């Protein structure tokens, strides 16, 4: 796979209306983009922007299922402080753990129909595996930003709440390290993100 990912970012603008008066100044509703590698769409690319003026993300609860000997979803982005439930929906035991970087944990062996919970209290990437089934892998990226997007199977992503301006960005995809840089958000701008 080409180690350069091109992320085309285009702004979606909305106009706020004040009653029957003329439209107010346009405000950015979302930053829409596409992740591409080797001319093909790339899924599971995570991009987040540092914006001190943006509201802090709220802690939430998420679920990463163990189903058909896979984790679903494979990539999850969660605000720091969020709790992830890891239910065993398979017909076999699993032993979910993360030993490197991010949140370190070992949930031990647990049977079908039960769940374990992990709170991701620090920012960073946690690689999650099953001690019994080595082909099972998932990733939880805990971030301190509310401006985050994850590309879908078509490479499309949306960062809700982004406004025009200059940002520090961070980007990651499975199999690569986190890269960082700065970008200016403006209509029709294309950004090239290259992993070393």
Q: Model-derived features: where do they sit?
A:
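Extracytoplasmic copper-binding redox domains, predominantly the cupredoxin/blue-copper superfamily
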Residues: 23-196
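Bacterial N-terminal signal peptides
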Residues: 8-18
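Bacterial N-terminal signal peptides that target proteins for export
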Residues: 1-9
């Amino acid at each position: 796979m080409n180690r350069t990912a091109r992320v085309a970012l285009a702004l979606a603008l909305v106009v706020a209306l004040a009653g029957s008066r003329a439209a107010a100044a346009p405000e950015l509703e979302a930053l829409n983009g596409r992740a591409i590698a080797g001319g093909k769409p790339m899924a599971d690319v995570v991009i987040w922007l540092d914006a001190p003026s943006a509201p802090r993300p709220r802690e939430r609860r998420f679920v990463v299922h163990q189903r058909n000997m896979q984790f679903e979803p494979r990539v999850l982005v969660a605000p720091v402080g969020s709790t992830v439930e890891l239910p065993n929906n398979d017909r076999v035991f699993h032993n979910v753990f993360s030993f490197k970087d991010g949140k370190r944990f070992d949930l031990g062996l647990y049977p079908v129909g039960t769940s374990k919970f992990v709170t991701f209290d620090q920012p960073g990437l946690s690689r999650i595996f099953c001690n019994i089934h080595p082909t099972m892998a998932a990733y939880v990226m805990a971030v301190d930003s509310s401006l985050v997007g994850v590309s879908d199977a078509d490479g499309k992503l949306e960062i809700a709440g982004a406004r025009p301006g200059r940002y520090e960005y961070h980007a990651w995809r499975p199999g690569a390290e986190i890269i960082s840089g700065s970008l200016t958000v403006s209509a029709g701008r294309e950004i090239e993100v290259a992993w070393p």
